[in-house]
Each structure stands twice: as C-alpha cells, then as structure tokens.
Amino acid sequence: MGSDLNITKQLQDYILKYGLKLHPIQKEIINHNLSLGDIKRMQISISQCQFLHLIIKVSKIRKVLEIGTFTGLSTLSMSLALPDEGEIIALDKDKKTNKIAINFFKKANQNHKIKTIIKPALESLIKIRNEKFDLVFI
C-alpha cells in the first residue's frame, strides 16, 4: 500500500475501527491487489482513501483529475464522495490495469462519473489543458 506520514499502528487501527467504512468494492480492489506482488505498492492506503473521501465531501468538489489510476482504488474512493453529477477524469497508460479498474467502477455503479483515458499523461494533459478541475490527484 501507499506510504503514510507518521501514522502509527495504533492510529491506523483507530482509523479502521472508527473511520469511514469501506465500500465492498473498495475491499474487493484491496484484496485483488494483494495478489499482484510488489506492484501493489502503487495502491493508496485505507487511511488515504478515507482522507480523500473527507476532503472531497467537505470541500464540495465536483470535478477531479487523477493522474495514475492503477486498479482504481483511489478513483473509486473519490467517486464515492462526489455528488451524482460529479466527474473524474482518470489518466493511465496501462491498458491491463485500466480494464481491471473499469470493471470495479461498473461493479460499484460509479462508471457514470468516471472517464478513463489510456495514454501517457503528458499527451492527455495537452488534450484537456483547457478544462478546469476542483482537485488534481497524482
């Protein structure tokens, strides 16, 4: 999982016990990623999922740009916090992991909020340079 800044085991346990509960598909993504070996380090942590969710809710964010989707845990975490008319543009160059992510988005009924672009980020950023976003997550 992604690295946490000074989050002790005790604090992590507290967050898991009393924090936002994970959606079943978030849990499914985490379990899927456990089978991927060392590359699973590209996944964000559960506390980071919860932090993103909180920031999006309290800031009333509507449009997000994500650079690097992997198997979709961060994307789904943000999408679940967005209003129904919210939107995420998720950029990634890996067709294989993108396909996995899209399947998870569909299972969670969030695919209507998420547009994925499979190209190197620089190419995609040039194409969408005139769009405005409330949050950019890298």
Summary of predicted features, one role per range:
Residues M1-L135:
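A short alpha-helical cap/connector motif
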